[in-house]
Amino acid sequence: MEAVDADLELLTSLLEENEAAESNSVESHEASSELDEYDELFDGDEDGSYHESDNGTEEQTVDGVEENFDTLFGDIDDINEEETVAPDTKKQSSVCQDKSKHELEDELRKMQEQMRKLQKQLQQTALAKTSSPGNPMKSPDNKLLLSGKTFQSGPLLERSLTVPKANLQDTPKRKQNLQDKSPLQKQMTSFLSPPDKSSTRPVSSTATQPVLNPVRSPVGQQYPVEKFSGLRLRKPRVSSSEMERKMNGRKLIRLAQLQNKIVTEKLEDEDWVTFGVIVKKITPQSSNNGKTFSIWRLNDLKNLDKYVSLFLFGDVHKEHWKTDQGTVIGLLNANPMKPKEGTDEVCLSVDNPQKVLLMGDAVDLGTCKARKKNGDPCTQMVNLNDCEYCQYHVQAQYKKVSSKRADLQSSYSGHVPKKMARGGNGLRERLCQDGFHYGGVSSMAYATTLASTTAPKKTVQSTLSNMVVRGAEAIALEARQQIAAARKNMVQSDEFKELMTLPTPGALNLKKHFSGVPTQANEKGGQPFQSISASALLKQQKQQMLGARKKRAEEIQKRFLESTEKSEKSSTLVSSERSVFQSPKQGAEFPNAQKMATPKLGRGFAEGEDVLFFDISPPAAKSNTSAQATKLAAIQKLQAKGQTLTKADPNSIKRKRSSSAEELVAQRVASHAPASTKSPDENEPAMKKHREQLAYLESKEFQKILNAKSKHTGILKEAEAEIQERYFDPLVKKEQLEEKMRSIREQECRVVTCKTCKYTHFKPKETCVSENHDFHWHNGVKRFFKCACGNRTISLDRLPKKHCSTCGLFKWERDGMLKEKTGPKIAGETLLPRGEEHGKFLNSH
């Protein structure tokens, strides 16, 4: 009974929440109907206002919203059925007390089943919403409009569906908590509130534009280039089709061409549009009449030196003053303003806020990554798509990138040299190493001080004699005398004497120390060890080698003379003792002496003896006694068996085997042969075997093995791609720097003009400074030129004032900061049909 009463109280509380949610939905509908309509940009040209009143387009947008709503929630038939159930529940609230408890339980069970269905539908729509790539962006208006459709999702609905019966006793407390909540919280917690059809109707066509044209930039995707502005946009606010419609019939003028177009053409007679990026926003200022205005600096990221100033007054300032820096905007029929005196800057203003179109954020706008000379980061704006460095730092960065390869190949160990650590590598130190005389001042004194400071100081061992102490020698003599007296008075024990009698290295060294015997080097009269330089050591070793070589040559000559005398006295003994295969010893013969002309046939015979030739061969050398004994034993065994050895025929070519030996070999082969019989494949022809092998090579199994690849090919490709990226990234950056330097044809700089000497240069002359001429610093433009012969020059005027120093012609052409690289030339380009032109015939007419 108590459980049924708790269910009844829960049902009544849910019905009350449903009524409160309906009242809130009616209030939200009334609030939404009071919203102002948002008019589109560039539409309508009457009385300075731009409104759209096409009913057909409104109906299309409404249909599009309903279709998108269907795709968001899927099948909404069940929700419509729920709408019909809600009025019935209102009627039942009046007679719910008269019904039996069983009927109430059945109704509660049905309601729980319906809630489960709603939960499943909401989960499916949530999954479809997260998985769909083109989710429409919800504006604040859409969030309010669709709030009635969301019911209760997530943990609130799950908690309400899974309430145990034991917790139903706390319903009075929950009812009190629900009464304390705000209407918005009640609407979020109520899961039986019916949807409001009127809330799905859009207020205006522009309010549904984000839903119809969703634009999202996924992470990691390349940003597309906008067609009209030529810039890459992040979070674009206008679709490409909408931009096509807006630009239809209007003239596009680039921001860099605006200055010439304003002067040469009448832009008031036609509709024209220009695009730019807000690169700088000046703090809002107050005019003389007390009204606030703001100024924007616009640029198209093509030429970062020229800017266009846009002034925002009145309503334009109130609506757009919060626009962020870096936003790409479009201007329709902007009004030109008079520039400031002394400048040629283009100034524009807009009289209507709808003439300013916010298109999105510029991806390529950034600041230079280099640092100034004072260490602060550079604040120059750059186009990141072209280069990451401004025109003032691109040359230094290019030199740094070009010299990286030499740095890698050098043998720099990372340790700073001592000279560099002391600061001896500055400009002053390098110039003043040898000294110079300039302007009546000599730098020899500074050079000597520099040499004394940079010279390495020799470390001297700090001893008592080196220190300036009075009576140092007397103190040292007294100490030596005390040590000698202590030695004499020292009593030696018996154990110490026994240890000293042992022939150990320690005992011997101690005896030498006590007896004061000089070292072995001093006994031989050699000089003590001293440190010498490397060059002196090399000279000393060279002298030692020359002396040793000279001694060796003298010994060889002396040995040769002795050997020749012995050979003359007893040549027979020398020839008999020398072995045939014995090589002469090193230094046995004098290399420069002439060899003896003794004939080899008469070797061993003295002068006057007869040489006899015999037909008998010389006697054989005596064999070893052990071999002779084994041979005799074998002969005796053969004779005991009655066998004899036949003498081998010396003229026979093949070795004859006995029949018994052949039989033994055949038996041995048969015993080692395999037991299996020969396969029939061995008897088949070789061509058939070859065909079978080819068939196996063409089989699927072999092709599968042949085409098998490793599982780590993906990782290998990623590693190769990473290596290629590391290799090509520096080259790509270097190429970007080169392209930027080639595109820079002029550059602003600080120059000085001397009115006395009538010149303009990058720095003043010393005479102008010393004589106090009338010169002043100002901004100038340096321009780069090249001649047809390849010579290059820089000028601060429109054209150089001098002829080419190489060819003498005055054919200057505009060029970039970097000299254009020329590749290898073909033979036709290097061919000179007329031969080489000589200097005296050049420029002759």
From Swiss-Prot:
Keywords, comma-separated and alphabetical: Coiled coil, DNA damage, DNA replication, DNA-binding, Metal-binding, Nucleus, Zinc, Zinc-finger
Region (OB-fold domain): 217-367
Domain of life: Eukaryota
Comp. bias (Polar residues): 179-211
Annotated region described as Zinc finger-like 2, given as residue ranges: 754-773
Start and end residues of each stretch annotated as Zinc finger-like 3: 787-807
Cysteine disulfide partners in this protein: none
ATP-binding keyword on record: no
UniProt biased composition (Acidic residues): 33-47, 55-65
An example Gene Ontology CC term for this record: nucleus
Residue segments, region Zinc finger-like 1: 368-393
GO molecular function: double-stranded DNA binding; single-stranded DNA binding; zinc ion binding
Entry-linked SMART domains: Mcm10
Compositional bias (Low complexity): 15-26, 120-130, 570-580
InterPro entries attached to this UniProt entry: Mcm10, MCM10_OB, NA-bd_OB-fold, Rep_factor_Mcm10_C, Znf_Mcm10/DnaG, Znf_Mcm10_C
N-terminal domain as annotated region, ranges: 1-145
Family per similarity comment: Belongs to the MCM10 family.
Described function: Acts as a replication initiation factor that brings together the MCM2-7 helicase and the DNA polymerase alpha/primase complex in order to initiate DNA replication. Additionally, plays a role in preventing DNA damage during replication.
Domain notes: Each zinc finger-like domain binds a zinc ion and is involved in both ssDNA and dsDNA binding, as is the OB-fold domain. The N-terminal domain mediates homodimerization.
Protein name as annotated: Protein MCM10 homolog
Origin species: Xenopus tropicalis
